Amino acid sequence: MNITAIFVTALLLSMNKIGGEPMNYDAGVQLEEACHNDHLVLDHDMNFRSLTDEEINLICKVVMTEARGESNVCQEAIATVILNRWLNPEKYPDTIAGVIYEPNQFAIDENIKPDVGVRVAVHNAIIFYNTYQMQIPYQVYWFRADHYHEDLGMPYISIDNTYFSIDENALVN
């Protein structure tokens, strides 16, 4: 049983009875299907959004380029920043490629081969998105090496040598 299957099984079990009522059948089927699909992200409205193999590989290339040598936790957080932007089309492009190729946003080596550690970090960012196991909240849109951005968001957390900033409006809501 893969980690996605374990996570979704636990989620199904925890949702089986809410307020004494059985879980909605359609929701159960959707969650069970997620067990067998490592390409689904649970968005802010609790709907599953699908990623293609090409999109996942693109995220892996960015993470490998931006965070080679950093911890799995840092790499997962960087992948989460990409997902955060993708799932916020009011501020950012609504495609993974659009987010990644937006001018001056992410470094990417098109010829790089992401290693297993990076693939695990990206996989974790996808399956744990919008759960209590996310490395960073969905309002974190920026990161950089060595220090926080001076003009984007507010300092949130540093992981290894990478500094993540949160949208200042997130703290108001």
Predicted regions located by residue number:
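Bacterial extracytoplasmic/cell-wall-associated proteins, especially those involved in peptidoglycan
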Residues: L31-N173
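Cell-wall glycan-active module
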Residues: M1-S50
